Amino acid sequence: MQNDPIGLMDSGVGGLTVLKEVQRLLPTENTVFLGDQARLPYGPRSVAEVTMFTKQIAQFLRQQAGIKALVIACNTATAAALTTMQQTLPIPVIGVIAPGAQAAVQTTRNHRIGVIATAGTVKSDQYRRDILAAAPNSQIFSVACPEMVTLAEQNDLTTTHARSVVAANLASLMDKKIDTLVMGCTHFPLLRSAIQHAVGSQVTLVDPGLATAEQTAAILKTHGLLNPATTRGTAQFFTTGETAHFDTLASQWLDQQPMPAKHVSIAQLTTPMEVN
């Protein structure tokens, strides 16, 4: 089971930012990633629907790849489905919100923390709860930024248009005197330059991906699941969207030239499968 891959899932390609951190921290681990681009965005969807999608993807990754752990590399899906998945799957399940909240608490100096995320993540209030649980004197300012997800999926990251959209989305944070901003959607680290430009150098950006990779490593170690191999692990990719578009983004964002993604139809995800 140590050689089995770590599964990662996201509503689109944003979760590749988490995969990149996992590969950097755990280079010998095998991984398999599924981006559900055909059903993007998850943000406006109901908790029940996002939970159903997460269950379908987890079932697919277990059946197709025999994953030893699941990283929900999507803040919206983490907020909606993490507890359910942890209660129902016989493997470790890691989300991105708790690690991101903890990183924000460790980073802030004035305890004024901004959170940018999808509407679903903001509505869940999970970042606020997790931050306040660790630092009750914190003030949290959350903003839903769905247009920024679209920018990332379209690979529009550094243009004047991208900077304009990001600045408009973050305008309500400008008078809040935050010193820390959580990029509470895995797409947003791809827009780091535009985000930093909008909020200024005095604000520290927190990418939950690194903290999530660190938590994944710790959990695998606790369960005796770390891969003892000494060679670089393999990486498989699946998408419910267009494979050519996915491959272009993956090759641009990851440190290595990834193998081509395989297409998965929604029918494949919604058909019941036998999983041991």
UniProtKB/Swiss-Prot annotation:
SUPFAM superfamilies: Aspartate/glutamate racemase (SSF53681). The active site is at 74 (proton donor/acceptor), 185 (proton donor/acceptor). It is an enzyme of class 5 (isomerase). Pfam families: Asp_Glu_race. Its EC number is 5.1.1.3. InterPro entries: Asp/Glu/hydantoin_racemase, Asp/Glu_race, Asp/Glu_racemase_AS_1, Asp/Glu_racemase_AS_2, Glu_race. GO terms for biological process: cell wall organization; peptidoglycan biosynthetic process; regulation of cell shape. Keywords: Cell shape, Cell wall biogenesis/degradation, Isomerase, Peptidoglycan synthesis. It catalyses: L-glutamate = D-glutamate. Provides the (R)-glutamate required for cell wall biosynthesis. PANTHER family: GLUTAMATE RACEMASE. This is Glutamate racemase. It comes from Levilactobacillus brevis (strain ATCC 367 / BCRC 12310 / CIP 105137 / JCM 1170 / LMG 11437 / NCIMB 947 / NCTC 947).
